[in-house]
Amino acid sequence: MYAVIVTGGKQYKVAEGEFLKIEKLEVGTGESVTFDRVLLVGNGDDVKIGAPVVDGAKVTAEVVGQGRHDKVSIIKFRRRKHHMKHQGHRQWFTEVKITGIQA
């Protein structure tokens, strides 16, 4: 069984037992999270598509940990002016393990 959920402004295809890195949630490690915005639920040939969400469907997950992604470098360069600006960014994420899909 698989589902497509929306969290942090992004869509993720998830299956039970899968680990996933999503945008940071203010939830402690070991706690449970429920995703109510489920766009699609599939089980073999049986596929339910929401308009826009599937009624009564939810995905539960357990928070495994918090962390930061690798650094992304931003460089702004002005040609012929001897000017360069360098900036780095590391985005926070929450790692979750999908524990159940209910449709």
UniProtKB/Swiss-Prot annotation:
Transmembrane ranges, per UniProt, are none
**Top-rank taxon, per record:** Bacteria
Pfam families on file: Ribosomal_L21p
Q: Does the keyword Ribosomal protein apply?
A: yes
GO terms of biological process kind:
translation
Task: Give yes or no: UniProt keyword Iron-sulfur.
Answer: no
What are the GO MF terms of this UniProt record? rRNA binding; structural constituent of ribosome
In terms of InterPro entries, this protein maps to: bL21-like, bL21-like_sf, Ribosomal_bL21, Ribosomal_bL21_CS
State the SUPFAM superfamilies in the record: L21p-like
- A cellular component annotation (GO) from this entry: cytoplasm
The alphabetical list of record keywords is: Ribonucleoprotein, Ribosomal protein, RNA-binding, rRNA-binding
Q: Give start-end of the signal peptide.
A: none
HAMAP family in alphabetical order: Ribosomal_bL21
Complex formation: Part of the 50S ribosomal subunit. Contacts protein L20.
Purpose of the protein: This protein binds to 23S rRNA in the presence of protein L20.
The record's family statement is: Belongs to the bacterial ribosomal protein bL21 family.
Q: What is this protein called?
A: Large ribosomal subunit protein bL21
